[in-house]
Amino acid sequence: MIVQPKVRGFICTTAHPEGCARHVGEWINYAKQQPSLTGGPQKVLIIGASTGFGLASRIVAAFGAGAKTIGVFFERPASGKRTASPGWYNTAAFEKTALAAGLYAKSISGDAFSDEIKQQTIDLIQKDWQGGVDLVIYSIASPRRVHPRTGEIFNSVLKPIGQTYHNKTVDVMTGEVSPVSIEPATEKEIRDTEAVMGGDDWALWINALFKYNCLAEGVKTVAFTYIGPELTHAVYRNGTIGRAKLHLEKTARELDTQLESALSGQALISVNKALVTQASAAIPVVPLYISLLYKIMKEKNIHEGCIEQMWRLFKERLYSNQNIPTDSEGRIRIDDWEMREDVQAEIKRLWESINTGNVETLSDIAGYREDFYKLFGFGLNGIDYERGVEIEKAIPSITVTPENPE
């Protein structure tokens, strides 16, 4: 069938299989063109492996270091006239290319927060790899979590803490810049967001993998966070999501102590740059900030996407054969170019004057839009979007029981 983008709010409800495959192909080509990673990881587990930083780290591990990879994610296959989710198509393309290159790649689709999916993953690691996982990437962005032991349901929210936040935001599709007010979160919302986006599940994963002897001596595990400039602090760093990320950082310190004593391993936090992802599109204020950031970083020739960021994380931080450089809080900083003084001063200056009339010229909102559509496989060169495509794509390692068409 012919697949066109259908955008509702900040989400696109359709995905293009060939476009997603092309996008993944571009990332793979980037990784293959880089000098190979010496001393890179060999057996990598990526939790949240189908889009964004998780997918990019899977590609860098596989095509940059020749690693075997297992990816865990929650995606849906095509059903009837409904396309699959982008992460499903991304993984189908990744696995196909990895297998053709002689690389081990298997995936598990299900709720990563559940005990059942953890057990399935452990069984696969024991059966196929006999343990020995030397890198675990934790990259989950989810709106809700069911606690595996208590069954309690937590929903995460993106809200400030303490007081109503007033600033401006942009409707990326129309380019309309308007004032936005966001009411502060309740205590329950703060706790819930921490339960979903904090370090609780990361710790459960690492403890389970350790218990079943799945981790190698010297294992590293990395989770991602964002700090950003003061401009976004109220809604991000000092808001509910920031509170959850503080919990994630605390978890990293605890896991680091455990892994260090048991396996000479490390647990690390990587502070990444702001990028267009399905997760960041949902945060008020942030898309306008990213549109300005893109323009300035592109002008200075220091713009990076997910794949460039993950390449730098692996090459210059995790596997540089030197001590991993961190900030005073022990975090890896690959947001260093974004946070450069000259970049931030320019954004601050433009922020004051940006409005609906000048947003297209002052910012790179067009680049934001382009990246947003690309997440769903649209707007890629060399794809005829007027042509019908087969929307059912198989992920080689996953057997799907066909649902009744809706």
Swiss-Prot record:
EC number: 1.3.1.9
Catalytic activity: a 2,3-saturated acyl-[ACP] + NAD(+) = a (2E)-enoyl-[ACP] + NADH + H(+)
Active site: 236
InterPro entries xref list: Eno_Rdtase_FAD-bd_dom, Enoyl-CoA_Rdtase_cat_dom, FabV-like_NADH_b, Trans-2-enoyl-CoA_reductase
Keyword annotations from UniProtKB, A to Z: Fatty acid biosynthesis, Fatty acid metabolism, Lipid biosynthesis, Lipid metabolism, NAD, Oxidoreductase
The keyword Repressor appears for this protein: no
Binding-site residues for substrate, renumbered to this chain: 226
Record's function text: Involved in the final reduction of the elongation cycle of fatty acid synthesis (FAS II). Catalyzes the reduction of a carbon-carbon double bond in an enoyl moiety that is covalently linked to an acyl carrier protein (ACP).
Family: Belongs to the TER reductase family.
Protein name: Enoyl-[acyl-carrier-protein] reductase [NADH]
Species this protein is from: Coxiella burnetii (strain Dugway 5J108-111)
High-level lineage: Bacteria, Pseudomonadati, Pseudomonadota, Gammaproteobacteria, Legionellales
Gene, per the UniProt record: fabV
